[in-house]
Amino acid sequence: MMMGSQQIKRQPAWFMLASEFGESTLNEKGTGEFDPTFVITKLGAKVNRLIVSGLVERLELRETSNGSQMYNGQIRDPSGLHYFSVGEYASESMREFVIQLLEKVDSGEPVLLTMTAKARWYQTDEGAVYTSLRPEEACIIGRDRYASWLVSASDATLNRLNQHQLTLNCEPTAEAMKDAGVAQEMIPGLLAAQTHYGQIDTETYRLNVMQALDIAEGKLEAATTPPPTLNLTETEDVTEQADEDLRSVVLECIQAMDNGE
């Protein structure tokens, strides 16, 4: 029993902006039954769980191909969108929460949400990669707590940017990274990221951090109201609907994998 407890030890949760997580196209899974799955970001974070916050931009109930129900949602932070889904595999408390959340969103009430979630990853037959979240815990928050999360996520992102910077002038080996001052826990992810992503442009992440901190300090208006509805042309409307349908299919595939775990 003790060995089993060690095998399913909960992984730490990362504070992370949507842009870093959403751009990830690399995952890693061990060979053991209880080995965790990681999404590896361009900055070398090996993410199994993460803490996100933002405005609930969309939430809807859909019926999957096998007849079960799934809630698909989007959370917007200053850097972009996180996608999440809550299905029949979720805890009773989470399902009850998302039902209440849907009522608020449908009423037009702007809702700031924070959640701790498992990182999910799916690759289509064509090779496209999509990330999403499976919420573990979530709650509605106010501006002050959102500002606190923005500071925490910005600080964590800057730390990963600094760690990545240390690797630019050293050989892509664990020993060289250690000698360069890279934190031991970041080395495996940074090595994998270098191999998969190659040279990356980090300027967007730095701009995301600056904007997040400006919002936290009250210099910019936080996103607490839904964005205005655009008058789309018929072609644009069809394209947007196709994108949403594809995202729903992907989330349904991820749910099916979760149900099989």
Question: In which residue ranges do the predicted regions lie?
Answer:
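Residue-level recognition of well-ordered beta-strand positions that form the cores
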Residues: 53-55, 74-76, 116-118
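OB/S1-fold single-stranded nucleic-acid-binding modules
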Residues: 1-46, 261
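Short acidic (Asp/Glu) patches
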Residues: 36, 90-102
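OB-fold (S1/OB) nucleic-acid-binding surfaces
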Residues: 62-94, 133-144
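Structural detector for short beta-strands of small beta-barrel domains
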Residues: 47-67
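Extended, charge-rich, solvent-exposed interface segments
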Residues: 99-114, 118, 124-240, 245-254, ...
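Core residues of folded domains in eukaryotic genome-function proteins
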Residues: 48-52, 69-71, 111-115, 129
